[in-house]
Amino acid sequence: MKVVRLTQDHVFKPFDCGESDLNEFLLHDAKLYAKGLLAVTYVIEDDDSTVAFFSLSNDRISLLESDKATWRRIRNSFPHRKHRSDYPAVKIGRLGVNANSQHQHIGTDILDFVKQTFITNNRTGCCFVTVDALRSAVSFYESNGFKPLRKINEGDTVPMYYDLTQLI
């Protein structure tokens, strides 16, 4: 398997993760997001198919997006002179694993790859990884160290974060 950064001339290999929204993003929107400089998408391919994909964009964590207890915990993890009104993050905008490859820890491998990339090759400075997790995926992200930004979450997704500083 190889990780490839999506380009405008990329030819997609077969992919279906079972979530039509994710399939549509990869096959129809990912190149548009890249062209508009909104997100960078990476595909993981083997000889015959797209095994998985994920897209990354810039983000931030601020008091407005979190409850006070979470914000206090985040802010207190930094020395007082480093307290800010928000902190830089990288957002996993989309992550999908081909249905044929699910339950093989590929999603966890992707999260580990993103975490290590931003620890070892952090070009712009970010200290968190964020995701708006589908409710059905919250336990997956929790098992990979992500925490909810708010105690009360309404809607289809749950904003979550991972603190990269715990890896250094």
Model-derived regions: residue spans:
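Conserved acyl-donor/pantetheine-binding loop and adjacent beta-alpha core of acyl/acetyltransferases
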Residues: S55-R94
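Short hydrophobic/aromatic beta-strand element in the GNAT-like acyltransferase core
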Residues: A39-V43, F53, A89, R94, ...
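Short amphipathic alpha-helix that is part of the acyltransferase structural core
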Residues: M1-L32, G36, T41
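Conserved GNAT acetyl-CoA-binding A-motif
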Residues: L111, F118-A133
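Conserved beta-hairpin
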Residues: L37-S55, K68-T70
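Conserved catalytic-core motifs of GNAT/GCN5-like acyltransferases
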Residues: T130, E142-Y162
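Conserved acetyl-CoA-binding loop-helix of GNAT-fold acetyltransferases
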Residues: H103-T117
